């Protein structure tokens, strides 16, 4: 019997997958517990429409990320910090401070966890901070660290 899985079932199939399973297993377990629905032409068409919708949503996310990447190319974020002798910072500039400055100065909200800056910024001047905007789209933020 052909079924469309509505949930992941360990060892059998993932959500949205169409598979042939034994009739008893389908009737007594999958259909009864609503882990799957029978693969009728109507259900198959509905699955196809869901997949198209999901693909369109995913493409929209990628397009939005690419637009944000282009916007970030022309932006410079200025962050001020206390310094000691020789332009050395007290502490470091974290991704949290960069995200807050970006929101305040340019009204762009980016999650601090998407920024790739493992040790922070420890010196004055310009630093390019890589940002993972999407699985496929990566951009950079130009950060200018100035003395407070």
From Swiss-Prot:
Q: Which PROSITE patterns match?
A: RIBOSOMAL_L9
What GO annotations for molecular function exist for this entry? rRNA binding; structural constituent of ribosome
Which of UniProt's keywords are assigned here?
Ribonucleoprotein, Ribosomal protein, RNA-binding, rRNA-binding
Q: Name one GO biological process term.
A: translation
The family database entries (Pfam families) matched by this protein are listed as: Ribosomal_L9_C, Ribosomal_L9_N
Record InterPro entries = Ribosomal_bL9, Ribosomal_bL9/RNase_H1_N, Ribosomal_bL9_bac/chp, Ribosomal_bL9_C, Ribosomal_bL9_C_sf, Ribosomal_bL9_N, Ribosomal_bL9_N_sf
Q: Name one GO cellular component term.
A: ribosome
Which family is it part of? Belongs to the bacterial ribosomal protein bL9 family.
Its function, per the record, reads:
Binds to the 23S rRNA.
Q: Please give the name of this protein.
A: Large ribosomal subunit protein bL9
Highest classification ranks of the organism:
Bacteria, Bacillati, Bacillota, Bacilli, Bacillales
Gene responsible for this protein: rplI
């Amino acid at each position: 019997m052909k079924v469309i899985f509505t949930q992941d079932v360990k060892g059998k199939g993932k959500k949205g997958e169409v598979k042939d399973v034994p009739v008893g297993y389908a009737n007594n377990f999958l259909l009864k517990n609503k882990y799957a629905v029978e693969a009728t032409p109507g259900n198959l068409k509905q699955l196809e429409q869901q997949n198209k919708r999901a693909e369109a949503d995913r493409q929209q996310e990628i397009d939005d990320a690419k637009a944000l990447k282009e916007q970030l190319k022309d932006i410079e974020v200025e962050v001020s910090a206390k310094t000691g002798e020789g332009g050395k910072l007290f502490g470091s500039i974290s991704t949290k401070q960069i995200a807050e400055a970006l929101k305040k100065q340019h009204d762009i909200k980016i999650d601090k966890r998407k920024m790739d800056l493992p040790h922070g910024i420890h010196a004055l001047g310009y630093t390019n901070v890589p940002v993972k905007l999407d699985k496929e789209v990566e951009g950079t933020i130009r950060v200018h660290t100035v003395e407070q």
